[in-house]
UniProtKB/Swiss-Prot annotation:
Keywords: Cell membrane, Membrane, Transmembrane, Transmembrane helix. It is a multi-pass membrane protein. The gene is mmpS1. This is Probable transport accessory protein MmpS1. Belongs to the MmpS family. GO terms for cellular component: extracellular region; plasma membrane. The chain crosses the membrane at residues 8-28, 81-101. It holds the Pfam family Mycobact_memb. It is found in: Cell membrane.
Length: 142
């Protein structure tokens, strides 16, 4: 009998220590309130978005220039305007927290420029002076 106790006393001590630790942790969890409570969702007011953002796309160049323009709307969906006379502009008004603003233009004139303005602050502007100019403007977080 002492041979069995002599042989298994270490595993028995480990089992007892693990059991005591489990009971202690369980008691501490109940004392300090770490159990989950379901929130009361019945009284929540809807979140109303305000402070609209005004994103203005502009493509400009010499008079008589015709351009093909691609841009992203407020939902990041691409749109294309073919053979648009410059200067060209498009305004997006949104209450989204972030908008990716992107405009790409290819023109047949000697120069072409693009500009993205957010709430009357110019965030991106590029001008290319080349025949059949190609320009793009990107604001990752408007």
């Amino acid at each position: 009998m002492f041979g069995v106790a002599k042989r298994f006393w270490i595993p028995m001590v480990i089992v007892i220590v693990v059991a005591v630790a489990a009971v202690t942790v369980s008691r501490l969890h109940s004392v300090f309130g770490s159990h989950q409570h379901a929130p009361d969702t019945g009284n929540l007011d809807p979140i109303i978005a305000f402070y609209p953002k005004h994103v203005l796309y502009e493509v400009f160049g010499p008079p008589g220039t015709v351009a093909s323009i691609n841009y992203l709307d407020a939902d990041a969906q691409p749109h294309e305007v073919v053979n648009a006379a410059v200067p060209w502009s498009f305004t997006i008004v949104t209450t989204l927290t972030a908008v990716v603003a992107n405009v790409v233009a290819r023109g047949d004139g000697a120069s072409l420029g693009c500009r993205i303005t957010v709430n009357e602050v110019i965030r991106e502007e590029r001008i290319v002076n080349a025949y059949h100019a190609h320009t793009s403007c990107l604001v990752k977080s408007a």
